């Protein structure tokens, strides 16, 4: 997307900022005889996507050059960004905003992930419903916010800081906990071959077989997103990116259906990739064509209730088909049930769009912290309650017990999110 820079000379610094249809001086490109880039219209400015993954180098930041008095006024009202000095002594304030309903979607989805990782009865329909469908929200939003940074180098720089390094860090942080848990359960430290199993599992994207096991299972989401980003980057280099992506989504459906029947593919990352690629591409297509932007509370509420109701009915049919041995129908119903759930949640988040809470924004920013560390707290809570209640078997929560436990876990992790924002941005993928 074209950078939205409106430069003005110091001689005109007391004039009001111009609109995108006005010019108050030559740009540096014009002075060098280079054709200036096409200006962005007002509609495009208001229609821009905001990067929820990188707030420092985002192309969705709106950089507007201001005269110095205007900048000082903005600073006095705490509306301006950092005062910077460019080579030609232009003053600007860096203004950036977030899409609030996307923050709500990410925050609710990550809370649902923690809730579903607390062991509960599989006989409770809505637990299975959330357990099966929650992740589609993350994949849709990841596709919706996907953008081209101009070069493979810049893309991989983002992937390195936003996905690869956090994946390695959170696996490394959890490994000492894995050793401590093994020691408590077995009365001693593991042998070398056993101790290396989770290491190999982490290096193989949380794979599990006779030689390795997942170290931090929920992190399968990060390599899956990385692979999807790379697929999109490769398809963009062709003239038929959407045809290729649609073909890959269709193939992923059949491979996922076959795997559900024959179980030939390993779990977690490969299976998650096959299952969620269509939702990622759907989000990407919506983002590229600037769809799903308008907010209308009454319409959004009706759509939310309708989509969730249809999704619940389809998921109940989906489970019935499984129990009656109708494998093909079972798989076919799974995808529309996911679509209904996805848009039901997103429309619900649009209803909440006018409610802006810093807590919700920080949960959205700190999604990686919660995904990467909540398993440690979940298993610790399970272990403590089993011993406190003298249970002879694994604990099984009721929903009204699991919900406050999940909120407590999120509250414990919240300070880590705040510390990461201020001092260790690598923890939140920056």
Go through each PLM region and give its residues.
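Alpha-helical transmembrane segments and their immediate juxtamembrane cytosolic regions
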Residues: 90-430
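Short, strongly patterned local motifs
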Residues: 1-87
